[in-house]
Design a protein with these regions (language model features):
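Carbohydrate-interacting/catalytic domains
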Residues: 1
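A boundary/linker detector
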Residues: 4-36, 40-262, 279-284, 358-362, ...
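A detector for short metal-coordination/catalytic motifs
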Residues: 250-253, 260, 267-271, 279, ...
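The canonical Cys-X-X-Cys-His
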Residues: 274
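Histidine-centered catalytic micro-motifs used for acid/base chemistry in nuclease
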Residues: 287-290
């Protein structure tokens, strides 16, 4: 007979209210879960007097095992809604029985929305990462489909970020070599989204996936179990983007393209798109410094302050290779009103080419922040 094993004590707030898992996962709900997985309504269940690691039920039947993550039963933040999913995923990956499946089940919720744009994106991410839904048709009014390619996933993430960039902490993009870079914040609820995003991309792509853990001064990594999941894929490369890496890159060259700089550009400017011609081919788009790294190295500041300036998201533009080269060589410049100026000694033929290849001759207003203009002023400042 199918048998559930479930830890009965919730973590955090619900613990003080006397709510236990058995109050949420009632016999009716467990019977429904059992029927949807095994085809049978009857089951046995052990509620263990132990603290639950997230919202997880484990069902043993025959020689198989099912891990079931379930939705919260009360209102919470959008990230907290999904933070138990990677925990269930970690337990699933640690399971030695290879005849196993990972599921998600919707439980009735008090005052919660199941269909915000963020929820729908995360559902697609979960499907792509190998999680099957048991009863989505009872709660979701539109069909949910997994992503079909890395570009499909990244574009959907970018559209979501554009609507609510203040809450965005995990980014993915195609790099110069055609591989995939994932930039992860490693604290708070963001770390759970980082795990799901990385796993989904690993399922979708045969290309190399660099997963950068953007570490702050406390040097906090992704949870060990999340790191183990990500590292279990042959095409993933888990990298600690810490201060030591930034310092080495800063000191060894003048064209800093560090993970933190790219992360900050994505956070400040959004997805890769040339500011002057609109090219959106990510392999061709580069982060162009406004105040050059070589100039920053020469100022009298501490090394920490110099790195902070060199990796600031306001100290840069997304430019295609063509416009980046013209900008660095001084063939074109940007004035304090955001207009593109062409060097006066250029031939008429070359001016015509630049005009033709630069349909956007003025930067968009949202780029021209006070911080950006400060870096622009520094670019053209004559050294004392």
């Amino acid at each position: 007979m199918p048998h559930f094993v479930i830890n009965n004590r919730f973590q955090k707030l619900t613990k003080s209210r006397g709510v236990r898992v058995e109050h949420i996962l009632t016999d009716e709900i467990l019977s429904d879960i059992c029927r949807r997985i095994t085809g049978h309504d009857d089951f046995t269940c052990d509620f263990i007097d132990a603290e639950a690691e997230g919202r997880l039920a484990v069902l043993h039947y025959g020689n198989r095992v099912a891990y079931i993550s379930y939705s919260p039963h009360e209102v919470g933040g959008r990230n907290s809604y999904f933070q138990s999913v990677p925990t269930a995923m970690a337990s699933f990956y640690e399971e030695l029985n290879q005849r196993k499946n990972l599921y998600f089940y919707f439980v009735p919720s008090i005052g919660s929305s199941y269909e915000t744009l963020y929820h729908l994106f995360m559902y697609r991410l979960m499907l792509t990462a190998g999680i099957d839904f048991l009863n989505d048709e009872d709660y979701i009014t539109r069909p949910i489909h997994p992503f079909i390619s890395p570009d499909d996933l990244i574009n959907a993430r970018d559209r979501l970020s554009g609507r609510n960039s203040s809450n965005n902490s995990t980014y993915a993009t195609i790099n110069d070599y055609g591989g995939i870079d994932v930039f992860c914040k490693t604290y708070g609820a963001s770390k759970y989204e980082s795990t799901l995003l990385s796993v989904a991309l690993a399922f979708l792509s045969d290309q190399r996936i660099n997963v950068y853990q953007i570490l702050e001064q406390n040097l906090r990594l992704l949870p060990e179990r999340s790191r183990n999941i990500i590292s279990s894929f042959d095409n993933t490369n888990l990298i600690e983007a810490d201060y030591t890496m930034e310092r080495i890159e800063f000191e060894e060259g003048n064209s800093l393209r560090s993970p933190r700089y790219l992360y900050n550009l994505l956070a400040t400017l959004g997805p890769k798109k040339c500011a002057l011609c609109g090219c959106e081919i990510p392999e061709l788009i580069q982060g162009a410094h406004i105040w050059p790294v070589a100039a920053i190295k020469r100022i009298r500041r501490s090394i920490e302050e110099k790195i902070e300036l060199a990796t600031d998201g306001n100290n840069g533009l997304w430019l295609c290779e063509n416009h980046h080269k013209m900008f660095d060589e001084g063939i074109i410049s940007i004035n304090m009103q955001g207009f593109v100026d062409i060097r006066p000694d250029m031939t008429r033929f070359n001016v015509d080419f630049i005009d033709w290849s630069t349909p956007s001759r003025q930067l968009r207003p949202h780029i021209l922040t006070n911080s950006f203009l400060w870096f622009l002023e520094k670019r053209y400042e004559v050294p004392a």
